[in-house]
Amino acid sequence: MAYERRSRPSGPRKKFFHRRKYCKFCSDSTIKIDYKRPDILHDYITERGKIMPRRITGSCSKHQRELTQAIKRARSIALLPFVVTEGR
């Protein structure tokens, strides 16, 4: 019993335009990464409480490391939650 393979249409594919992500902290030097500012750090955490990766946030590697350290410090002194509790 062999299965029949379905071929894809051989027409032209749509080309997607990927917008270049930029580091918000490199472009605007007035924004500082600080563990005491959870309003800024909250933008880099998912709704589940996980730290967003660099490929999604668009920040450079230097600032991503600083963000990670600041988020972990803010979690340890209870400015940010480790895990977000689900509403019942």
From Swiss-Prot:
This is Small ribosomal subunit protein bS18. NCBIfam families: S18 (TIGR00165). HAMAP family: Ribosomal_bS18 (MF_00270). GO terms for cellular component: cytosolic small ribosomal subunit. Binds as a heterodimer with protein bS6 to the central domain of the 16S rRNA, where it helps stabilize the platform of the 30S subunit. Part of the 30S ribosomal subunit. Forms a tight heterodimer with protein bS6. Belongs to the bacterial ribosomal protein bS18 family. One of its GO terms (biological process) is translation. Gene3D superfamilies: Ribosomal protein S18. Keywords: Ribonucleoprotein, Ribosomal protein, RNA-binding, rRNA-binding. One of its GO terms (molecular function) is structural constituent of ribosome. Pfam families: Ribosomal_S18.
